[in-house]
Structure formats: C-alpha cells, structure tokens
C-alpha cells in the first residue's frame, strides 16, 4: 500500500482519494462517523484489501460480509459460478462469506488495523472516523454455534485475539516505514471493533425466529441491532404492478415468497417490542431496507433456478418499504438503507433521514470503488443528525422513482459490454473503451500518461 501510494498516488488502483471534512462528522451507536455511506455486505467487504480500497475511495460505514455456521468449501460448493451479473439491473446467486469464519474475522481485523493507519498516514480523516457493522445469519442455532459466537465476541473486543496482537506487533515493528503514523498511534488503536449488528435471515424465516435472534443479540450480546427486511413486505400485487409499470415486466416471480416471508402485520408488533427492549438498554434499534429480491432465472442469466435482484429495479421496491415503515412508525423507526442506492438517489435518501446507506450494485459497475468518491463528495454538507424520518419526503421518493430515467427500464436495451475474446485468467478485465475503439487505441494508458504529465508519451 505504502509503495503503491508513493509511486502512483493510488491504493489498490483507486485513483482518487476521499478526504473527510473533520468539521462535518456525524455520530451513530455512540461513535464518530465521517460520512454515512459505504459498501454493503457482499463482494466488496469480504477481504481486508476490499475494505482498504473502499475507505480510500470514500466509504466510512462498512457492512461486513455475512458470516454463518456454514462456511469454507462446504459453502462454496453450494454456490454456482458465476454468481453475479450486473449489466443493467443486477442479479446474484451468492450467499455469505466463502471463507471460514475465523478467516473472515482475520480479514476484518486486518482491515480495521489498516484503515486506522492509512487514515492518518495519507491524511484521509480521523483514525476513529469510520465504523464496521457485523452481518450475521441465518438462524439462532447457527448464531449460537461456537465459531459464530467466538466471531461475535472477538469482533466486540478483539484486544486479546491473536490476529489483533499480531497486526499491532507487525505495525510497531515497521513503524519506521511511516511518515506520520507513530508508535503511540498504533498503540491507541481500539480493539472494540463492532458494537452494531445487522441480522440477515433466509427467505421464509418465521417471525418468531427473527425476534429470538434479535432478542439474543440485544439482551445477551449488547449489540445495537438492525433487522434486514425483505421487499416482499409490500405484497405481490404492489410489487408486480410496480415492476410492470416501470418496464420490468420480463422479470419473473410468483407469490410464493410473498406468502412465505415475514408478513407486514406480524412485522409491526415485533418491531415495536424490539424498540422497547432496546430503549430499556440504551441501545439503538432499526431495520435494514432491504434484502435482495428473489426472482426466477428465465434467460440463463446465472447457472441457478432462482436468483436475487438488486440495483436500479430494486430501488422502487426498497424505497416503498422504507416509506411504508416511516409512515406507520411516525418516522421514529431508524432505517439503514441498501436497495439500489446510487449517485442519483442517495442525496434524497439521506435528506429524508434514512442512513447509513450501503451499496453493492453500483460499485459492481465500471468505475467500481472510485464511484464512492463521487458519492461521498455529494454529502459534503453539515454532518447529518438523526432526528427521525420524514415520511413526506419518502413518499416523494417513491413517486419520483416510478418515472425516473435512472430507474425505469430503457426502451432500447443497453449494448453489451462483454467481448467475444478469451480474457486472461489473472487481471482479466479488458477496458471496453479500448475494444470498442475502431483502431483499438490504448485509451487507459493514454489517460494515465496525461494524468502523470507525460504528454509526449501519451501522443506516441
């Protein structure tokens, strides 16, 4: 990281660093937060280098990839590959982390340590201006299993874990490599990594099980807690009509999950009970809106019978769930958002009082993590403070989404960005601009040379 940054000004290929305005930080879960956006639990939060790249680009709230009892090769064998396609709206058939749970924990702790030192070394923000959020699933028995329980306990208080001590010792041994980070800075890195959790459950999980998981994590573990909700809370008719009206009539789904998943009339009293329990313990409680949406594989999009929709087509459903809850809870139920959030809608989401906001699909598109710098730059205003959710604003977001050119399916399909050539096994990305150019100009190299001021080389 240090060598690449010194040579190119980049970190893991991320070209533009986001520098936080320390006068505009906010707070959540009793801790500082320099901005309320970051990557959602998924492919962008599985490895330490994912977390470093996202932070450098502007992320400050990290929803770590979900851990569960099934892990490693056992889990990998259940996931058909490829498992993600994101040409316009996105689909996936992936699951939780494919690492063993202890390996996942090590990656998260390594990332935690790395973010602390690069924040000061590169002048990106405060050493404690970001937060990690655990995502766990999928049933109470699995969460109580020894390896997941160890994960939860260690992520709360990692000071005595071998990986934390190893990382700290390594940094202290190499403190001479840093120009700004001191031994005192390294010694000051807190081992209290996570104090919040997002509960992820499988489709069809009974409401009683969801409530038991939440009660356990709140009362036994003391976590600030979010429950991830599904778009199926809207009901089949609303979801089908919305998709049809917006040009997504080709997306196939039946009413099974709408009947099998948590029902809205069961969700409301459950959420009220959990709000009361958290208030008694001075903990924050809320919902995560939303999970991905199960649809049928119809055009061989992925090697699976069912896949999970996200991105631009999920947004009108997710923001409708948020609006419904904002209205029925008088704006008092906290909502963490992930469901098609991107550059075009995130200001409105946060302005309505919905945050933190995490993203996956938009970062899968060309630009990748660099998109986070653009998104974080939108939010350089006064630090947001949660005073409730404005249901009038969420209602407006719902109506705007139905006609927004950024969410309605285009009549003319987007051209494929794929090429017919065999790509290399390693470094397999080939710039589509180069392939699309009639003379195959090396556009990316040209841009890099111009940025470096090497104009004559760029013209060769």
Residue ranges and their predicted role:
Residues 309-331:
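Generic long, charged, amphipathic alpha-helical segments
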Residues 48-54, 211-215, 327, 340-359:
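Catalytic cores of alpha/beta
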Residues 370, 374-375, 380-460:
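Ferredoxin-type iron-sulfur electron-transfer modules and their immediate structural context
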Residues 1, 6-16, 20-21, 25, ...:
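Active-site entrance/lid segments in N-terminal catalytic domains of soluble metabolic enzymes
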Residues 72-92, 363-391:
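C-terminal helical cap(s) of enzyme catalytic domains, especially alpha/beta-barrels
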Residues 41-44, 291-293, 333-346:
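Glycine-rich beta-to-alpha transition loops that act as phosphate-gripper elements at the mouths
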Residues 58-72, 229-231, 348-378:
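Glycine-rich phosphate-binding active-site loops on the catalytic face of alpha/beta enzymes
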Residues 32-38, 282-285, 327-337, 446:
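Short beta-strand/loop segments at the ligand-binding rim of alpha/beta enzyme cores
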């Amino acid at each position: 990281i240090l060598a690449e940054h010194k040579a190119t000004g980049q970190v893991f290929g991320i070209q533009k660093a986001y520098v936080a305005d320390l006068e505009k930080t906010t707070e959540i879960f009793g801790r500082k937060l320099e901005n309320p956006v970051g990557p959602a639990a998924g492919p962008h939060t599985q490895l330490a280098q994912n977390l470093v790249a996202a932070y450098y680009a502007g992320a400050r709230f990290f929803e770590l990839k979900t851990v569960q009892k099934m892990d490693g090769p056992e889990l990998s064998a259940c996931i058909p590959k490829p498992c993600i396609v994101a040409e316009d709206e996105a689909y996936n058939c992936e699951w939780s982390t494919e690492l063993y749970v202890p390996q996942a924990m090590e990656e998260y702790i390594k990332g935690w340590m790395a973010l602390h030192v690069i924040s000061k070394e590169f002048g990106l923000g405060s050493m404690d201006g970001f937060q990690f959020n655990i995502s766990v699933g999928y049933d109470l028995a699995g969460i109580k299993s020894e390896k997941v329980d160890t994960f939860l306990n260690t992520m709360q208080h990692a000071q005595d874990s071998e990986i934390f001590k190893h990382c700290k010792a390594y940094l202290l041994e190499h403190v001479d490599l840093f120009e700004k980070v001191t031994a005192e800075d390294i010694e000051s890195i807190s081992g209290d990594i996570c104090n919040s959790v997002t509960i992820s459950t499988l489709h069809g999980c009974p409401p009683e099980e969801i409530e038991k998981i939440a009660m356990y994590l709140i009362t036994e573990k003391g976590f600030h807690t979010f429950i991830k909700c599904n778009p199926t809370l809207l009901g089949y008719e609303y979801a089908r009509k919305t998709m049809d009206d917006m040009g997504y009539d080709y997306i196939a789904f039946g009413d099974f999950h709408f009947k099998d998943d948590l029902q809205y009339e069961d969700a409301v009293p459950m959420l009220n009970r959990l709000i009361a329990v958290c208030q008694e313990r001075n903990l924050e409680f809320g919902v995560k809106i939303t999970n991905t949406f199960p649809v049928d594989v119809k055009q061989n999009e992925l090697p699976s019978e069912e896949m999970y929709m996200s991105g631009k087509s999920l947004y009108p459903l997710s923001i409708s769930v948020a609006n419904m809850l904002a209205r029925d809870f008088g704006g008092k139920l906290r909502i963490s958002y992930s469901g098609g959030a991107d550059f075009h809608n995130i200001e409105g989401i946060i302005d309505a009082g919905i945050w933190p906001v995490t993203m996956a699909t938009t970062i899968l598109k060309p630009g990748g993590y660099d998109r986070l710098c653009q998104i974080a730059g939108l939010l350089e205003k006064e630090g947001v403070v949660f005073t409730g959710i404005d249901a009038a604003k969420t209602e407006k977001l719902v109506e705007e989404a139905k006609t927004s050119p950024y969410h309605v399916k285009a009549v003319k399909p987007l051209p494929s960005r794929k090429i017919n050539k065999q790509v290399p096994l390693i470094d397999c990305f080939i710039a589509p601009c180069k392939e699309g150019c009639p003379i195959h100009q090396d556009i990316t190299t040209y841009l890099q040379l111009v940025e470096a001021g090497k104009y004559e080389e760029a013209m060769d």
